[in-house]
Amino acid sequence: MIGDSVDIEMRVYEGAQATINKIFITGNDRTSDHVIRRELRTIPGQKYNRSELIRTQRELSQLGYFDPESINPVPVPNPQNETVDITWELAEKPSDQVELSGGWGGYFGFVGTVGLSFSNFSVKNIKDFSKWRPLPVGDGQKLSVRVQANGRQFQTYSFT
C-alpha cells in the first residue's frame, strides 16, 4: 500500500509566563480567610508556578480543617493580560474532639475523664456571637479542656 502515512507539523508559540492576579477562596464556612491565606504559596504578583500550587494544596491539607480530597485549585488564565486567577475550592471537615472515659477501681471507686478539644478556635471572636458555632471559631487556635477525677483523692484540671 502506497501513501499510508500522514506528516503533521505543529508549531507552538510560547507566551510570557503568567503572573498571578487574584486569589479567591470558597467553601470556608468556619475558617477565616487569613488562616488560609497565610498557607498560600500562590501570591498575587508572583509568577505562576505549578509546583507552588501543589505545595499549597499539601499545606492546606495538613492544617486538618479541610477534606484533603476536596482541596481543589482552579487556575483561570487570562491570555490578554498574561495573568491567571486562582480559586481555591475547599470543603471543611469536623476537627473538634470529645473525650469521655470512665472506670471502677476497688479502693478509689469511680475514675473518670472528660475532655473537649477545639482545633479551630478564635479568641478574637469571643465577643462576636455570630462567629460562635458552638464556640468562636475560625482563627486556627487550639483550645483544650480536660478534667480527671476519682471518687476519693485525685483530681486534675487542664486548660490549654
Name what the model sees in each region.
Residues V84-I86, F110-V114, Q155-F159:
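Hydrophobic, lipid-facing positions within transmembrane beta-strands of outer-membrane proteins
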Residues G112-S117, K124:
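A short, contiguous, amphipathic alpha-helix enriched in charged residues
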Residues F118-N120, A149:
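Residue-level signature of outer-membrane beta-barrel architecture
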